[in-house]
Amino acid sequence: IYDVAIDPLMNMFTRGNTNDGGGWNIRFIHHIQSGQYGYPMLFKHFTDEIIPALQDLGGGSGTGALFLQEPTWPEKFNNVPMMCDWGRSQLIIHRVTPDGASFTQKPENFIRLAQIADVDVDGSGRLYGAAWDGAGYSGNPKKGYVQRYVPKGWKFRRFPDPAKLKDKALVELLRSASATARTAASQELLNRPAVAKDVAAVAVDRTASLESRVAAIFTYKQME
């Protein structure tokens, strides 16, 4: 496993890598704390002793991962785990649907990028993909590049430096519809223990989004 996509409610998703060879296919997994998912051998021979993956996806090389929740992106591409597959040169959206205590999923090719190694998004909503593109197994400083992606009609809006925001504005950033903004606010708030009560107020505010309340809970817990 090279990376983990974590949604705002702390569900964790991974797309495995077959670099061990010997029939270890890509598996898309919803991780539950302390779960045994069978790597490297149990899932092949002792499936009754493990928590199964949501799906075996065949060969590939899973690398970077991201859960995208950004209000600047259309609903079609938003609120989804995105997974890089280096071997397939694809950024893949996994359409996850709640199913009891877990999910079902359906993969969908999204962006083709040569040997894509990682993906990330900034506070303004710009998506970035890192292309290995023939750099070999040892790397090559003359190979590879980063590609930027934005949806049609996207307009740039500068993301504020959280460290320069006043306490009230920083706490308010926890209410953002952007996962990137909430994370940035949470990290900076840890440096300001005096506003812990204001963070707790977001956690108990029933008018706030569930995502914002969860972000406030995890922030407050670290401020204690």
Roles of regions detected by a PLM:
Residues 48-51, 202-203, 216:
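Active-site-adjacent structural elements in folded domains
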Residues 163-172, 193-205, 224:
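Amphipathic alpha-helical scaffolding segments comprising HEAT/armadillo-like alpha-solenoid repeats
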Residues 182-183, 211-214:
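Alpha-solenoid HEAT/ARM repeat scaffold
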Residues 188-189, 213, 220:
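Hydrophobic core/packing positions within alpha-helical solenoid repeats
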Residues 1-172, 180, 184, 188-191:
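Beta-propeller domains with acidic blade repeats across secreted/periplasmic ectodomains
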Residues 177-178, 206-209:
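Short inter-helical turns and helix N-cap capping residues of alpha-solenoid HEAT/ARM repeat scaffolds
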Residues 37, 195-198, 212:
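Intrinsically disordered or highly flexible coil/loop and linker segments, enriched in small
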